[in-house]
Amino acid sequence: MPNTVYVDTSLLLAAFSNEPNQPIALAVLQSPQWDQVCVSDWTLAEFACALHAKVLRGETSKGVAHTIDQTIKRLLEDGALQRLPVIREDYNAVRRVTPEIRCLVRGADALHLAVADRSGMTHFASLDKTQRLAAQQWLQEVSCVPELNK
């Protein structure tokens, strides 16, 4: 079985932004243990919005945001990042599984979990504590990365 990791928006954004957790996020993305590093169409949509918000708040420039966007596109084209579609079944899974989760998971975060579950990921990468807790409940056979002490 291939060693696959689904990367959510929190980890992807930290890897490409000047954030305190950037070294952790980069270590996850660049780890040689992965056969595939996967993001969903939803991850990419959230990433674009979050990057734009950083521009509007003055945390980064339009030029830097454009460079980051081009880097993501290149990683997708080169196959370093695999793109997973979001399908109707994922939305149905969110409605079906969310009531069984024992933490307050946002719909947007539950969609990441549904895509990772349907796609058979072996690992789930997030820097969001609540998202990781929800992942441990939904994706019981999946390991969360990175190991966080928080």
What do the predicted segments below correspond to?
Residues M1-T4, R74, E89, L113-K150:
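Acidic, PIN/NYN-like endoribonuclease modules and their adjacent C-terminal/linker elements
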Residues M1-T43, K54-T67:
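Short, well-structured N-terminal submotif of metal-dependent ribonuclease cores
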Residues V7, V39, P85, G107-A110, ...:
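Short beta-strand scaffold positions
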Residues P20-P23, A27-V28, L56, L75-D78, ...:
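Noncatalytic, solvent-exposed loop/strand surfaces
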Residues Q33-V37, Q82, S119-F124:
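Short active-site oxyanion
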Residues W34-Q36, I68-G79, A135-Q140:
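Short, mixed-charge aromatic SLiMs
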Residues W42, D69, K73-I101:
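Acidic catalytic patch
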Residues A48-C49:
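Well-ordered alpha-helical segments within folded domains of soluble proteins
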